[in-house]
């Protein structure tokens, strides 16, 4: 009993350790829209792993809010899936094809579909009525079909690329070899936040329109 008590005490101490503090609480109210928490975590993984784009499985975020004080336990509860991360390379044309699959009508009609949070730099505006992109930009420039981008994906989503994106690893290997660049995305997130990255006011900017949908071409939306 004494041993168990000591173990519990050490475990409690470990998970109550403060990882970071945000300027305010960040929210993730739905998995089928861009969210503050989705922006934060996708940005952390993009920057820490050095990829052009990180597509974060929206369902990986299990809580509707996090912070402003974030303990190790809070982070693990909010983001419990400790996947490896795969680095793949996609052309602009393939990236657009992947998003067409992700934004198909079934997603908005409540079907069980994967949805993704976008890292900083990628802006997609989609007209649901015409099934076309109004804007598809990277770093402020229209995405060229032939340009190749480095893209980070969690292991689960890498394994399910065909269903989620209607594309296969075999197709992407024609662009470049595929490799694992992290064995623990949770550790990457924790270490980046603990180092003081992504915790200032710019993280808490609200939803900034990295991905927007509209039934009419009304211009950028922050939906």
Give the location of each predicted region.
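Catalytic centers of hydrolytic enzymes
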Residues: 1-48, 52-223
């Amino acid at each position: 009993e004494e041993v168990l008590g000591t173990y519990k005490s050490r475990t409690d101490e470990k998970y109550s350790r403060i990882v970071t503090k945000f300027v305010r609480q960040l929210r993730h109210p739905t998995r089928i829209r861009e969210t503050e928490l989705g922006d934060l975590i996708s940005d952390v993984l993009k920057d820490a792993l050095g990829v052009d784009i990180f597509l974060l499985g929206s369902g990986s975020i299990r809580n509707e809010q996090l912070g402003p004080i974030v303990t190790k336990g809070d982070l693990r509860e909010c983001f419990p899936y400790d996947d490896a991360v795969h680095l793949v390379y996609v052309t602009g044309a393939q990236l657009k094809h992947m998003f067409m699959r992700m934004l198909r009508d079934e997603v908005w009609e409540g079907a069980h579909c994967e949805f993704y949070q976008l890292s900083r730099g990628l802006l997609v505006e989609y007209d649901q009525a015409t099934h076309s992109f109004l804007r598809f930009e990277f770093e402020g420039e229209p995405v060229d079909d032939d340009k190749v981008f480095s893209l980070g994906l969690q292991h689960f989503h890498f394994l399910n690329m065909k269903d989620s994106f209607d594309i296969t690893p075999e197709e992407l290997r024609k662009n470049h070899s595929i490799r694992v660049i992290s064995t623990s995305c949770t550790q990457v997130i924790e270490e980046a936040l603990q180092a003081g990255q992504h915790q200032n006011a710019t993280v808490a900017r609200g939803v900034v329109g990295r991905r927007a949908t509209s039934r009419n071409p009304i211009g950028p939306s922050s939906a």
